[in-house]
Design a protein with these regions (language model features):
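N-terminal type II signal-anchor transmembrane helix
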Residues: 1-52
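Short extracytoplasmic
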Residues: 48-75
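Surface-exposed acidic, glycine/proline-enriched linker/cap segments
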Residues: 139-154, 358-365, 512-519
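Small-residue helix/turn framework positions
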Residues: 68-90, 95, 109-141, 163-173, ...
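Outer-membrane beta-barrel proteins
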Residues: 98-104, 150, 469-475
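N-terminal leader/targeting segments and the immediate start of mature chains
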Residues: 50, 358-373
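Short, surface-exposed ligand-recognition loops at beta-strand->loop->(often short) alpha-helix junctions
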Residues: 34, 384-386
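Non-catalytic accessory/assembly modules
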Residues: 150, 155-169, 178
Length: 611
């Protein structure tokens, strides 16, 4: 049985030696058997055939045969075939492997291309498709590729072999017809694996544009359909220092309303990204980080986002959203988002509620985001409205062409409940707005203590109502620019820093005195009721009543809060009129500045009239 093994070994050895001899002989004899002009003209024709343009080679070709047959060309230019002969690109050096057997037979076929310092000029048509011309082999393959049974199909006569393409230190200029802008990419390095036109493609591209390095990873089983502006499966990811983005699914590069898949976006520094793209949004500095991961699908004139996972400044949200672009109407973003924690300041900035048309550092029409309507329903376990914290919040944002409304329908605040309505007028929000706020049963004592507010302020569980408006843009309005009314009511509390008995005693012997010099006890009250009108930077108080068990404090006058000044008149009188003889009314004036008011008893001649 083993007798035939030596013979078999000899046969194998002889066969290998013959093959090796032929291989070496071909490599040695190739320079004498192959015409350099044939290979040069062959690749020149191949380039012209592929691109559909006229390829010209000015440099002297170099042919290598070891370890594989390869031709190296230099000073290549590609021009249009018409009379204008417009230059479309240049290549400093191009090398390609070729078939030795085909070259000996007088035919040249090439693969494994390497381009050194190519400089390409591309045009992106208004349809979104790159202009591949309609004459080259690539353009014909793109035009004739079709989808059958979920697969890309191409006629065999158009299905040419490619292999691998590598690009080193290239430059690409893309003229975008729709915007009229030209985008330049420098330092382009690419590695493309594409066995033949009908095969799947994988590509990695690294480039630099506007001072930023970008990396694009792309793969598709149907690249011709993708390049031709048809819908097909693809995977793409973009990475840079300013953002990372990823998409996997079915897409159409010329028609965005044909999309289905999963996408992710992460922006670690929003202001830096806006600076890079030369955009400015007032107040956006508070929105530092943003990320989004979602399933996306096209719907008529828009997109639907399901399984949304969104994060802004570390606040995470889940939900569903949709965006619509109805013909002839404003775009609209709607949806429902549930946050674990939410910062309303970041939320306002994120949705551009403070964007002003005509700002010195903004576009004159307010920008594209100004043309977006919103209809969002929001909820949060905890929400920050600096310096306050809300819990179990239900809110909504509605923005139309004429107004913007923000509502907190329900929330827990300091042991009580809070609701609010903010409304901004006009589409660019520079027509002013109004705010309505209602707080019920909140622990103002704990709030005042936590905020470390100074002065005689009511420590009690109470309710507050506020209704103010302004004609100034909301992002510019200050406290002195609003008008309206504020009211506070409370039961059973205390007013620290106001000792009624000590004030009476000091008023009998001094013409004026600092309140904090005589008030070392709190004034206990059973009812606190104060209302103030706000206008021109001042609060006007009309008959505020603070009723204690024995005495009542009545205040009226003006508080210019812009300067922290005080201009009030007041009276301390008996709560029960029947005991007035023992507690006669004491009228006084309040001046100085908050939080250190100065008391000045009214003259005796005025006490009668005041009484």
């Amino acid at each position: 049985m083993t007798g035939w093994l030596p013979s078999f070994a000899r046969l194998v050895t002889v066969t290998l030696l013959v093959v090796l001899s032929i291989f070496v002989a071909l490599r040695v004899a190739a320079p004498y058997l192959i015409s350099t002009g044939l290979v040069r003209s062959g690749i020149e024709d191949a380039l012209s055939k592929w691109a559909g343009y006229r390829a010209e080679i000015a440099g002297k070709p170099v042919i290598e045969f070891w370890p594989t047959p390869r031709i190296i060309l230099s000073k290549i230019s590609v021009r249009q075939k018409d009379d204008g002969a417009k230059l479309l690109g240049t290549v400093e050096s191009l090398s390609a492997e070729f078939s030795l057997i085909d070259a000996i037979r007088g035919r040249a076929s090439f693969h494994e291309f390497h381009l050194l310092r190519p400089n390409l000029l591309l045009t992106r048509e208004s349809s979104g498709v790159i202009d591949w011309t309609n004459e080259g082999l690539l353009a014909k393959a793109i035009a004739n590729a079709r989808e059958e049974g979920g697969r890309e199909v191409l006629d065999k006569k158009l299905d040419a072999a490619i292999g691998a393409i590598t690009v080193e230190d290239g430059t690409v200029n893309v003229a975008d017809v729709a915007s009229g802008r030209t985008f330049r990419f420098d330092g382009v390095t690419a590695d493309v694996s594409w066995r033949k036109l009908s095969s799947p493609i994988t590509a990695v591209l690294i480039a630099r544009t506007s001072g930023q390095d970008l990396k694009l990873d792309f793969s598709s089983r149907s690249p011709l359909l993708i390049f031709g502006g048809k819908s097909a499966e693809m995977t793409a990811s973009l990475t840079s220092g300013l953002l990372t983005a990823r998409f996997q699914g079915v897409a159409n590069i010329s028609h965005l309303f044909d999309l289905s898949g999963n996408m992710a976006l992460s922006i670690p520094d929003m202001p830096a990204l806006l600076t890079w793209v030369d955009r400015s949004l007032p107040g956006i500095a508070t929105l530092r980080t943003f990320s989004l991961e979602t399933d996306v699908a096209s719907v008529p004139n828009g997109f639907r986002f399901d399984n949304v996972n969104m994060s802004m400044n570390g606040s995470n949200a889940r939900g569903a959203m949709d965006v619509a672009f109805p013909p002839g109407k404003r775009a609209k973003l709607g949806g429902t988002l549930a946050f674990d924690q939410m910062n309303f300041r970041s939320l306002f900035d994120a949705f551009i509620l403070r964007l002003a048309a005509g700002e010195a550092d903004g576009p004159p029409d307010g920008g594209l985001l100004q043309k977006l309507d919103l209809d969002l329903r929001l909820s949060a376990k905890q929400a920050l409205v600096e310096p306050f914290t809300l819990s179990d919040v239900g809110a909504s944002i509605i923005v139309s062409s004429n107004e913007a409304k923000f509502d907190i329908g329900d929330s827990q605040f300091e042991g009580g409940e809070l609701s609010a309505h903010l409304e901004a007028m006009r589409g660019d929000f520079d027509g002013g707005g109004r705010l309505q706020l209602s707080i019920r049963g909140a622990d103002f004592a704990g709030l005042i203590e936590r905020l470390q507010l100074q002065g005689p302020l009511p420590l009690a569980t109470g309710s507050l109502d506020m209704s103010v408006k302004t004609s100034m843009p909301l992002w510019k309005a200050g406290a002195s620019d609003v008008t309206g009314r504020i009211a506070f009511r409370a039961r059973s509390g205390s007013l620290p820093g106001f000792d009624a008995e000590a004030v009476r005693e000091e008023a009998a012997r001094a013409d004026f005195f600092p309140l904090n010099s005589v008030s070392h006890r709190a004034f206990a009250f059973d009812n606190f009721d104060i209302t103030a009108d706000l206008a021109d930077g001042a609060a006007t108080i009309h008959g505020a009543r603070i009723e204690g068990p024995q005495q009542t404090l009545i205040l009226s006058g003006v508080i210019p809060y812009r300067s922290s000044g005080l201009a009030l008149s007041g009276t301390i009188e008996a709560t029960d009129p029947t005991v007035s003889p023992s507690l006669p009314p004491l009228p006084f004036f309040v001046g100085g500045a908050w939080p250190e008011p100065v008391i000045s008893p009214a003259p005796v001649t005025q006490q009668g009239s005041t009484k």
